[in-house]
Amino acid sequence: MSTYTTEIDNVATLCQQQGEAWSAINPESVARMKLQNQFKTGLDIARYTAGIMRRDMENYDNDSSKYTQSLGCWHGFIGQQKMISIKKHFENTDRRYLYLSGWMVAALRSDFGPLPDQSMHEKTSVSGLIEELYTFLRQADARELGGFFRELDAARESGDEVETARVQAKIDGHVTHVVPIIADIDAGFGNAE
């Protein structure tokens, strides 16, 4: 059974247990929302991306051709578009990270305006940018899965079982846009302002 189908069944069981009070809840709609929001907290993202980084470091230690690429960004939208493009061209985000440069954060993300020194930005600048980036990356997941759900509905409506199975496999095999973010030391903590 697919992940999506299992999620629907779990919600349907829960709705039945709650009786009439939950009878208007559509289990498939709930399952879709859960899949579109797989990361509930920053800690979920941290655990997920730490696992990726550990795996990538081990792979690199065993084979130096398995290096990672870090793509610089200074705004959530930029990071989102980079990951959407990478997934479109490579079908996954394997060994692709986002990168925050100290000078870029100071020049483009400082709450006090552009600052001359790469380490002169507020200590909240980087954490705010990371939160923004992960919000945009999670939105990219929701958008992509929403498209898959529309395809699934159309395939079901047309009665095309082959297309339904193909789209179902896309949903179950969905690869998130959420990737590790690397920051150089100057992008780390900023000043104590």
What are these regions (language model features)?
Residues 130-133, 169:
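Extended, non-catalytic scaffold segments that flank or surround catalytic motifs
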Residues 74-77, 82-83, 93-129, 136, ...:
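Glycine-rich, proline-tolerant flexible connector loops at the mouths of alpha/beta enzymes
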Residues 181-183:
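Residue-level marker for buried hydrophobic side chains located in beta-strands
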Residues 2-76, 84-91, 147-176:
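N-terminal amphipathic alpha-helix/helix-capping segment at the start of soluble metabolic enzymes
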